[in-house]
Amino acid sequence: LEQSSRYADLTLDEAGSLRNGEHVLVAYIMKPKMGYDYLATAAHFAAESCTGARSTDDAKESANAVVYYIDADSQEMRIAYPTVLFDSNLTDGRDMVRSFLTLAIGNTQGMEDVEFGKIYDFYLPPSFLRLQESPSVNTMWRILDKGASNGGLAAGAMKPKLGMQPKPFRAASYALWQGGAYTTADVQANQAPTQASEGIPEVVKAMRSCVQGTDVAKRHSGGNYTDEPKEMDARGKYVLSQFGPFSGNCVSLVAGYAAGGSARHTFPRQFVHYHRAGQASTSSPQTQRGYSAFVHTKISQVISTTSIHADTMSFGKTQGDSPDKSIAVMLQDDAADARLCNQEWEGMRQNAPIISGSMNALRLPAFFETLGNSNVILTADSGSFGHKDGPASGAIACRQVEEAWKAWRSGQYGNVSLSDGVVEFAKTHEEIKGAFLTFPKDADEIYPGWKEKLGCTAEASVPPASFVNAKISTASSAAVATARTTMNAAKMASQSTAGSAVNPYTGGLKSIHPASSSNTARTVLLSRQGREAALQD
């Protein structure tokens, strides 16, 4: 059914639509199937996105979506959707993002005359945005006592996906936190190997002990992937009840649009860690249908989550491209500078970008330089636990390379390349040097000549470590002996007065403060007795 006269108007002025504020503008890459006219297919696409090509009438015309721009050669199509199309809540009158998704990203992308269609940007007018909610909790740096902005790297999320039992998980969390990392994540939730009723109390013990020892806030991201709102509510309340005074440091880890909105409403005071569940199936550069990663992230901003995975511009394992930088910048700025038009956020609070995907210390400096800052949450499970000297050294190395990047940027090493600056920094920082030996393939690609510069030509590279119970800490015997002799007995006694529920880790423990220089960041986490106590308690 030819509907271009009703659902297309190529004379429509985009600037005028922006001024009147009555349309949501959506930009697509769309290709008709062979033999179909581009404009006719675009009009059919618009019709099925709104009032319907076969059931419309003149009375519905004010609600018609209109194709206002096409370029058949570049396969670009833009549609203006009247804001009156979108559903709103009965309870408070707010517009529904779900309604926008249904119309703009619905089944139109797979119609009989459409080869593919993919959204690469959209614009929401102020009238639509003002009917959305801003997060009750802003960026996570306040939680970690790092200031409201420019908080720097919050590194080291550990997220075992299956099979780690409660006590090893507690010990691993403790080791990572003691290494200067701020975050652990529990995506196991209530799986058979680690029931929530057993696992969460163990993490609480680790956080309590670590915060007491370092006087530095830590964060735990509790898995709250559920099918039902009641289950989400029950899990969230249970976790918060267990953490008690540390409940403000708990994050609700959710996946999917509905879950993000539900978590925000149910737990308005908690930081919402929003995971783009299955995002690669739609937002990967290899996918011709769905929407780009930029669009997915923009939607998360609209539903007012407080953080979202922003990928790593191909510095990690996940496919990415230059728009990934735009994603991270958009989450932290008051406006999104995009391909379609500038999106003002109307005072919505900032989001915190999360980067993940097999990142390690060696890959971070170039990522920071490309992004222009280091204000991200890093999940570096393999980068921390894969380090040859264990998770603490892996976490310390991630913090150290941030310092190395800042030192290079400030001109401390003169007119040298970033890679040479990091190598120079590594000469006096054993954890980074250990990362070079642990990840030699990355080292060879990013830091040519590193072996000669670091004097490692005679040293064999070592395989990444695997996390096993016996390797929570790989502190040398000499370091352990030093820790034993320097430990203040009175402090140890005071730490142990509350019993194992407060401080289950005994033995040679030397704490550090993340604000200290990386020269003081090297630490002995657990003596041999401490490791055994951590595993057997």
UniProtKB/Swiss-Prot annotation:
GO biological process terms on file: carbon fixation
Listed GO MF terms: magnesium ion binding; ribulose-bisphosphate carboxylase activity
Disulfide cysteine pairs (residue numbers): none
InterPro entries linked: RuBisCO, RuBisCO_lsu_C, RuBisCO_lsu_C_sf, RuBisCO_lsu_fd_N, RuBisCO_lsu_N_sf, RuBisCO_lsuII
Pfam families xref list: RuBisCO_large, RuBisCO_large_N
Note: Only found in Symbiodinium A, a minor symbiont of the giant clam Tridacna gigas.
Family affiliation: Belongs to the RuBisCO large chain family. Type IV subfamily.
Record function comment: Unknown. Probably does not have RuBisCO activity.
Name this protein carries in UniProt: Uncharacterized ribulose bisphosphate carboxylase-like protein
Source species: Symbiodinium sp.
